[in-house]
Amino acid sequence: MGLNIGLRLWLPQDRFSGVPWLLPGIELLLLVALLAADPGRVASRASRTRAHRVVILLVVLLVVGALLVTALLIDNLITGAKVTQAPGPLLAAGALVWLGNNLAFGMLYWLMDSGGPMMRARQPRQIDFAFTQQLSPELAPPGWRPVFLDYLHLGFTNATAFSPTDVMPLTHRAKYAMLVQSTVALALVGLVVARAVNAFT
């Protein structure tokens, strides 16, 4: 989460419209609140529920922020803003936005699947994503459960292949989320690469 916030701050803020510190500042405050109310250190069920709500709010803000930054970059590409004139800054901004999107959606998948990590630890009945190790238990160690790295890998492969690879979405919400991510990634990569090639020539 901290890495995603940092990526936003590395973007060329003077070339993007809006208040550059607003969304990262809100996300940072929520991250501090989450660390202060770590559900692994509190015994009260009500406190764990509050911490879980903070996590949900933080991840939703990260995803919304990723989509807003993508929309701003696409708008700059269409209107021919200064950031899109030189291929170097354009490719750097595009790479940072693409990476931030993948991190945000990886966290969304991690939080979405089976109701989140705490519910997954209780052997959930309904899963949102089917991993290879779940479909073929003989390929996995006993008691295998997906961890954040598995969802981060899902986010990167979905943004790169624009389709499911080794993890299948099973529920409507999982399919909608992957559809949004792959569509945004396709638009971002297509426009950035096309503009960069045009700037080189």
Where are these regions (language model features)?
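Hydrophobic alpha-helical transmembrane segments of multi-pass integral membrane proteins
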Residues: 1-5, 27-34, 56-73, 96, ...
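Hydrophobic alpha-helical transmembrane segments
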Residues: 1-8, 28-46, 116-139
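Short, hydrophobic transmembrane alpha-helix segments
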Residues: 7-20
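Structural signature of hydrophobic alpha-helical transmembrane segments
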Residues: 17-31
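Membrane-helix interface/capping segments
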Residues: 35-54, 70-84, 114-115
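Pore-domain transmembrane helices of cation channels
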Residues: 77-118
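Membrane-proximal soluble regions of multi-pass membrane proteins
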Residues: 111-167
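Pore domain of cation channels
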Residues: 145-201
